[in-house]
A protein has these predicted regions:
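Helix-loop-helix module between adjacent transmembrane segments
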Residues: 112-114, 148-155
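A generic structural motif
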Residues: 46-55, 138-148
Length: 205
């Protein structure tokens, strides 16, 4: 729900898989040929491959490279028990690997809105984000849950939602979109990696 994903990358592409263009066609092969005709001139940046580098590097996001830094104290942080354990722990990026592929279909409506049928965990949040991205009133964006197909947190973020609706509104025709596994792995939001520092104190009991 933090608006840090542009609908299409502009000025800067931040990762392999970030959308830079969308194409609609009446056959997948025609769409592939159209995609192959798109040329993008990239200036390669030095990659940021860990969080510490990203904190110190020049920002690649409008609000900086750190989305959230949390300090959590539970109990008295200055208390010292008979046993104290502290350390830094790291959790790597994970893909939720749900069984159902990412897919959806959007229908333009006669009232100027759009009807989106898609797998999601957050119908109302998705509607709000799509409406905001398309500059439409929320009541003109109608999102219907088309089954979940597994999620595990992986369907909390919008992926193809806005693209589907943009294409349907632009063409005036229903538009279906399906990501294959490679496209999901490259482009969809994964469970984020994290670095966590803990100090635990306890008494003998």
């Amino acid at each position: 729900e933090h608006p840090d994903q542009p609908v299409l990358a502009f000025d800067m592409v931040r990762y392999v898989g970030e959308p830079v263009a969308i194409v609609a066609a009446n056959h997948p092969e025609v769409a592939k040929k159209a995609i192959d005709a798109i040329y993008v001139d990239y200036e390669q940046l030095d990659p940021l491959v860990n969080s510490r580098e990203a904190i110190e590097a020049a920002p690649i996001h409008p609000d900086g490279n750190v989305i959230r830094h949390l300090v959590i104290n539970h109990g008295d942080p200055d208390a010292v028990g008979n046993i104290t354990v502290e350390g830094e722990y790291e959790v790597g990026m994970q893909d939720q690997a749900f069984l159902g592929t990412e897919s959806g279909i959007a229908f333009p409506s006669t009232d100027g809105g759009v009807d989106l049928h898609i797998s999601t965990q957050w119908l109302h949040s998705d509607r709000d984000q799509v409406a905001s991205a398309l500059n439409l009133p929320e009541d003109l964006v109608r999102v219907t849950l088309a089954g979940v197909g597994g999620a595990f947190g992986g369907r909390e973020d919008v992926s193809m939602h806005v693209h589907l609706c943009m294409l349907a509104l632009h063409t005036g025709r229903p538009v279906k979109m399906v990501y294959d596994r490679n496209e999901s792995f490259l482009g969809h939001v994964h469970r984020h990696p994290a670095k966590i520092w803990f100090r635990h104190s306890a008494d003998d009991s």
